[in-house]
Structure formats: structure tokens, C-alpha cells
Amino acid sequence: MTEKINKKDNYHLIFALIFLAIISVVSMMVGSSFIPLQRVLMYFINPNDSVDQFTLEVLRSPRITLAILAGAALGMSGLMLQNVLKNPIASPDIIGITGGASLSAVVFIAFFSHLTIHLLPLFAVLGGAVAMMILLVFQTKGQIRPTTLIIIGISMQTLFIALVQGLLITTKQLSAAKAYTWLVGSLYGATFKDTIILGMVILAVVPLLFLVIPKMKISILDDPVAIGLGLHVQRMKLIQLITSTILVSMAISLVGNIGFVGLIAPHIAKTIVRGSYAKKLLMSAMIGAISIVIADLIGRTLFLPKEVPAGVFIAAFGAPFFIYLLLTVKKL
């Protein structure tokens, strides 16, 4: 039975990878100008001889690559948060991590944009970490029900959004415009430098994931049971929280405030993959990547010549999905 599940999981992972590759190639082809598949393939074979080098290399490739990396980061972080909080509707944007990172990023854009832009991810990570620590303080105060923890997270997110809106009203018009574009979640202006930064962060946290993955089946159990089986529960939680906070904060610092990916991707992944936690993590990463690539593709082609941020389409699907989970998930 286990072998049959593993085979199915492998097939699903391969299919997801192929689908991600196909949708990425389609995204390379479609935009303000259509580039035939043959010319896209020629660019990959010999970029320097391609007549579409500028469009593909400067405008589309960085954007698609960043969408894949950001989606993967958000998908993995969502799965880890649901595991740590033992709450099926936990996600970075719902429990306030995204809000904390967004507030810090907007503070940077509004008041410190004259400094190097490379400090923006650092500000976002610090904001996300503060939000997570506040949530942990509430969790360690006693036996808080999962629903209560989610309500606290939503309250924090609402507070952060209110503070962001206040900043946008009082700051300079140009800075406010930059912050607004970032807040709605757009991949416009993505560069290969952005993809390198996020790619390096993801690679840097891989060793932390290897510490977590082998023990995930035990950590899913209730804390007393896991401790009885020899698991350092608090250490495992801390590793996952640090990893997920870094991934979320770095991703949204580069692509903006794209919500609900960390909620949707893990649920779809857990529905498709029934086996190991490692495969669920990989599937969450791929579902997250696919969702942002598709949302960005729709956003920049559906209303040409105008462009709608990817975050708008993710939210349009994610909000009803969240309500559905609230109505159907048991034992909250």
C-alpha cells in the first residue's frame, strides 16, 4: 500500500513539474507582443542570436523565474506554519507575518528609499519576525484554541494594514505610489538580481529543511506524544518558524504583498500527495509557483495594454477558498 502511494505521489510530482514548465513557456510566449514557440526555443538554444533577446531576457524571463521562486517560498512556508500551529487554515497572510513584513517594507519605501534598495528585504524579514514573535507570545500564554489563534492573527493583520494605510496617506506622493504598487503584489520590473537574491535565500534554508523533514511525521502528533517519542518539539517548531518567516518575508519583499498562496498551495498539495512530508513540501512549492505564474500571466495579458497585478487574481480566488475552509474544516 505504501509503495503504491509513493508511486502515485511521484507521478503527481512529475506531472506538476511538467505543467509548471509548460505554463512557464506559455508565459514566455504571451504578452504585449506574441513570440512563437519556435523563437522561444531558439532563445534558449542560442540567446545571443535571438531577435527576441531583449523581450525574453530582460522583460519576461526574470519575471517568470521570480514568480516561480516566490510561489515556491510561499507554498513551503504555508505548509510549515500549518504544521507548527497544528491549524489547517494557518498561512502567512492570515496570521499576520505578511502584514508585519509589509508594514516594515512600506516604512522603508516611505522614509528610507534614499538608501540602497537592497535593505528592503532586511526590513521585511525584521517585520515578519516581529509579527511571528507576537503571535508566539499569545500561543505560549496558555491553551489557546486554533480558532482563537487565527482570530488574533487576523486582528494583527488588520492592524498592520491600518498602519500601512496611515503611512500611505501621510507620506510623499511618489513614495506612496511605489508602496501601493508593491502592496497589491506585482512582478512588474522584476530583474535577475531579484531572482538571484531569492534563489540564494531558498538555497540557504535548505539545510534547515533537511533537519526538519525526517521528523515531521512525529511533530504532527500532539506535543506530549511527540516529546515522549524523543522529539525536541520546541526546537523543531523554532526551526520551522524561522525558516517560514525568512521565506515569506524575502518573497514578499521582492514581489509585493501576494496573499493566500501560503493557504491554497499546502491544501492542494496535501490533497494530491498522501505520502512523505518531503513530497508534500515539494508539491506545495510547485503549486505555489504555478499559481503565481498563472496569476501573473492572466494579469499582464487579459486587459492589454493595461496590466493587473498578480496579487489581485490570487486574492480573488483565495478569499472564497478561505471562507470554504472555515465552513468545512473540522475541530477548530
Regions found by a protein language model. Give the residues of each.
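Alpha-helical transmembrane segments in inner-membrane proteins
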Residues: 1-332
